[in-house]
Swiss-Prot record:
Superkingdom of this protein's organism: Bacteria
UniProt cross-references to InterPro entries, sorted A to Z: EF-4, EFG_III/V, EFG_V-like, EFTu-like_2, G_TR_CS, LepA_C_sf, LepA_CTD, LepA_IV
tr-type G domain ranges (all copies): 2-184
Gene3D superfamilies: 3.30.70.240, Elongation factor 4, C-terminal domain, Elongation Factor G (Translational Gtpase), domain 3, P-loop containing nucleotide triphosphate hydrolases, Translation factors
GO cellular component term of the entry, any: plasma membrane
Topology with respect to the bilayer: Peripheral membrane protein
Protein name as catalogued: Elongation factor 4
Subcellular location: Cell inner membrane
UniProt function note: Required for accurate and efficient protein synthesis under certain stress conditions. May act as a fidelity factor of the translation reaction, by catalyzing a one-codon backward translocation of tRNAs on improperly translocated ribosomes. Back-translocation proceeds from a post-translocation (POST) complex to a pre-translocation (PRE) complex, thus giving elongation factor G a second chance to translocate the tRNAs correctly. Binds to ribosomes in a GTP-dependent manner.
Keyword set includes Zinc-finger: no
Residues at which GTP binds: 14-19, 131-134
CDD domains: EF4_II, EF4_III, LepA, lepA_C
Primary gene name: lepA
Length: 598
């Protein structure tokens, strides 16, 4: 066990985690040059296209160190984006140390900070590494000082490397062996293994990625899942080199996979503990705290025949993505679907894209909302995640909106723009500290404003240099209203939205104007209205298409023309009373883009 090292790589988006992990795999000979491709561990198409890591992946490598010993390095690549922080905390729970990778040109960013503090709270050894020293903009000395100032760990001797060119990679490996402590565990005791991740394989059932804390697990053991009490015989055990390599046994301190032919999708929940039936551990390992969804949106299949497939797809996806929450919902406009909870907007986009790609579904999404706390006049307190579930306005005593604490790191020259943006988003400044050229700001901003487009606008006002990390702190009373959209005097529940009263009128006006361009014209006028309760705050009309019924009258008597026009008018009136309007998917998405063009 003294030769095992378990570690993760934590870093901000685009600081070179995946490239560094490629280089480590290559150096230790995990894959031959022919099999090597860039971003080996980003196995999903979406990860490659967007250039981001979404899922944590694990690899076991053998490293022949300079002291003549061979070390087993188990490392877990983690995502850097703020929406996938939950994946990071799970990966860190399985490790004794973490490599903190910082771009020597960009310096410390907010997400680096957040993940680094998570690692420190778990008492992990944090090893700083300055990456991308081959870039002309790199300034490793300044960045090393930044790490000391902002994070407070000693970075004077930090390894300087370039994952792209391979410079300094052997130093990184030596540093891992030297600084990160070996795991401690009892080899002979009862088995305790933590499930870091699970996914569903059509042939093998549930595949679980586990970290064995105590004891050992081998093929043929009767494995018991502690939360459900289910017992299954172990079929395969091994680790990833990144390819699956069967070893038949995993001992304390090791990270690998276990397949026990579990066909039930919820058979091995993430964060659970595995033990062996008959020689059981006394208690389960402390799991992870569940990530609470911050954003909710309705997902509906375009054709109602896909509902069953959609339900199965969500079940399979949720085993792999433990932070996804869903429950059935039905809408008068869109039929049956699910209300899903996500960690943020990027998470929502990724989930929708994975469902459409991997399961071949066609989906409509409604506008995302956050959870509001509503106190009714009867004194009940409700948590509401959908505008459709809001009680009538006169039954509401008080609405409280969730407030997020946002930590923003921004270079001094963009400070003014960022402060202006935070004020527009109804933010309250609580702290501001200067660290060299960087400024650390802390704001309390309503979660509803943060999840809509705050991240995008923060990036554009600061030319991409500002970085953001946020978490929920409290509910606070606010003057919120529900804006309903009426099409031909009928409410469309899927388009309702909750917003602050001060912005509601301009919001309603923008929305109906935008929808006017998206709804196809009919043979009769379509009235689009935005309303708060029974008060109409904005209106716009989709003009009718008119057929020229007088085309075949040459000259002739005026009464003949009047008769034809009257007949047309009656026909339109009848049509309007029975005609219904199809709303295209773009109209539902229009809600997301209000205010972006300003």
């Amino acid at each position: 066990m003294k030769n095992i090292r378990n570690f993760s790589i934590i870093a901000h988006i685009d600081h070179g985690k995946s490239t560094l992990s490629d280089r480590l795999i290559n150096t230790c000979g995990g894959l031959s040059d022919r099999e090597m491709e860039s971003q080996v561990l980003d196995s999903m198409d979406i990860e490659r296209e967007r250039g981001i890591t979404i899922k944590a992946q694990s690899v076991t490598l053998d490293y022949h160190a300079k002291d003549g010993e061979t070390y087993q390095l188990n490392f877990i690549d983690t995502p850097g984006h703020v929406d996938f922080a939950y994946e990071v905390s799970r990966s860190l729970a399985a490790c004794e140390g973490a490599l903190l990778v910082v771009d020597a040109g960009q310096g410390v960013e907010a997400q680096t900070l957040a993940n680094c503090y998570t690692a420190m709270e778990m008492n992990l050894e944090v090893v700083p590494i300055l990456n991308k020293i081959d870039l002309p903009a790199a300034d490793p000395d300044r960045v090393a000082k930044e790490i000391e100032d902002i994070i407070g760990i000693d970075a004077a001797d930090a390894v300087r490397c370039s994952a792209k060119t391979g410079v300094g990679i052997d130093l990184v490996l030596e540093e891992i062996v030297r600084c990160i402590p070996p795991p401690v565990g009892d080899l002979t005791g009862p088995l305790q293994a933590l499930i870091i991740d699970s996914w569903f394989d059509n042939y093998q059932g549930v595949v679980s990625l586990v970290r064995v804390m105590h004891g050992q697990i081998k093929v043929g053991d009767r494995m018991k899942v502690m939360s459900t009490g289910q017992v299954n015989p172990v079929a395969k055990v091994g680790y990833f080199t990144p390819k699956q390599k069967e070893t038949g046994i995993l001992k304390a301190g090791e990270v690998g996979y276990v397949i026990a032919g579990i066909k039930d999708i919820l058979g091995a929940p993430v964060g659970d503990t595995l033990t062996i039936s008959g020689h059981e551990a006394a208690k389960a390992l402390p799991g992870f705290k569940r990530a609470k969804p911050q954003v909710y949106a309705g997902l509906f299949p375009v054709s109602s025949d896909d509902y069953e497939n959609f339900r199965d797809a969500l079940a399979k996806l949720s085993i792999n993505d433990a932070s996804l929450f869903y429950e059935p919902e039905n809408s008068s406009a869109l039929g049956f679907g699910f209300r899903c909870g996500f960690l943020g907007l990027l998470h929502m986009e990724i989930v929708q894209e994975r469902l459409e790609r991997e399961y071949d579904l066609n989906l409509i999404t409604t506008a995302p909302t956050v959870v509001y706390e509503v106190e009714t006049t009867r004194g009940e307190v409700l948590h509401i995640d959908s505008p459709a579930k809001f009680p009538a306005m006169n039954d509401i005593e008080e609405i409280r909106e969730p407030i997020a604490e946002c930590n923003i790191l921004v270079p001094q020259e963009y400070l003014g723009n960022v402060i202006t943006l935070c004020v527009q988003k109804r933010g309250m400044q609580t702290k501001m500290v200067y660290h060299g050229k960087q400024v650390a700001l802390t704001y309390h901003i309503p979660m509803g404003e943060v999840v809509m487009d705050f991240f995008d606008r923060l990036k554009s006002t600061s030319r991409g240099y500002a970085s953001l990390e946020y978490n929920f702190v409290k509910f606070e009373a606010a003057d919120m209203v529900r804006v309903d959209v009426l099409i031909n005097s009928e409410r469309v529940d899927a388009l309702a939205l909750i917003t602050h009263r001060a912005n509601s009128e301009s919001y309603g006006r923008d929305l109906v104007d935008k929808m006017k361009d998206l709804i196809p014209r009919q043979m009769f006028n379509i009235a689009l209205q935005a309303a708060i309760g029974s008060k109409i705050i904005a209106r716009s009309t989709v003009k009718q298409l008119t057929k020229n019924v007088l085309a075949k009258c040459y000259g002739g008597d005026i009464s003949r023309k009047k008769k034809l026009l009257k007949k047309q008018k009656e026909g339109k009136k009848r049509m309007k009373s029975v005609g219904n309007v199809d709303i295209p998917q773009e109209a539902f998405l229009a809600v997301l883009h209000i205010g972006k063009d300003k």
